């Protein structure tokens, strides 16, 4: 039993260290897409309607939020977005939520159950997630009015407007 606890504990610590190094490397070296044009995508919303990035943005700055229903940190960021969405829209910034590889029924049930009134696109095949080099969730991409990626964060910072200029 002691051996199981010892090796089990070591496995947990090793996993935590590897995850920390992965995120630190992402933050230290930056995302290779910063400064580049945001990749165009076509995704469906929860009602099955297709949307493209350019169709939603219409030349405005945008915040892309990659998330998943199973992610506890994503849930807290969804709550923040839900509270601030009107203020963000008043500033002329579009918010695009992209759920990672889950079905629209599952996502809709989650949104309804949690009283979230945000528009969601679903990346069921993972292509958009791959195009945006998502290291983990939650991940926010800040896209300027010119369509270039300005910053990548794992939370919605208070100074998000500065990141978009």
What spans do the regions from the language model cover?
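N-proximal helix/coil linker or "cap" segments that precede and/or mark the start of modular domains
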Residues: 6, 14-40
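A short beta-strand-turn-helix
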Residues: 42-62
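Thiol/disulfide oxidoreductase modules built on the thioredoxin-like
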Residues: 58, 109-116, 123-165
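Short pre-active-site segment immediately N-terminal to redox-active cysteine/selenocysteine motifs
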Residues: 60-62, 67-70, 136
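Hydrophobic beta-strand anchors of alpha/beta hydrolase catalytic cores
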Residues: 63-64, 95, 140
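Conserved redox-active cysteine motifs that mediate thiol-disulfide chemistry
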Residues: 66-83
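Solvent-exposed loop/turn segments at secondary-structure junctions
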Residues: 68-72, 101-105, 126-128, 156
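Conserved segment of the thioredoxin-like fold in thiol-based oxidoreductases
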Residues: 76, 86-125, 137
């Amino acid at each position: 039993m002691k051996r199981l606890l010892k090796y089990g504990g070591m496995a947990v610590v090793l996993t935590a260290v590897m995850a920390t190094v992965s995120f630190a490397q992402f933050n230290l070296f930056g995302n290779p897409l910063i400064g580049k044009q945001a990749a165009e995508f076509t995704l469906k919303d929860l009602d099955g309607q297709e949307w493209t990035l350019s169709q939603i943005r219409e030349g405005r700055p945008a915040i892309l939020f990659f998330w998943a229903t199973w992610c506890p940190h994503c849930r807290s960021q969804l709550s923040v977005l839900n509270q601030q969405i009107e203020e963000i829209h008043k500033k002329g910034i579009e918010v695009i939520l992209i759920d990672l590889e889950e079905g629209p029924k599952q996502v809709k049930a989650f949104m309804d159950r949690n009283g979230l009134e945000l528009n969601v696109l679903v990346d069921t095949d993972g292509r958009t997630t791959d195009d945006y080099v998502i290291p983990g969730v939650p991940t926010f991409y800040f896209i300027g009015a010119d369509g270039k990626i300005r910053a990548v964060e794992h939370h919605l910072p208070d100074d998000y407007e500065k990141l978009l200029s």
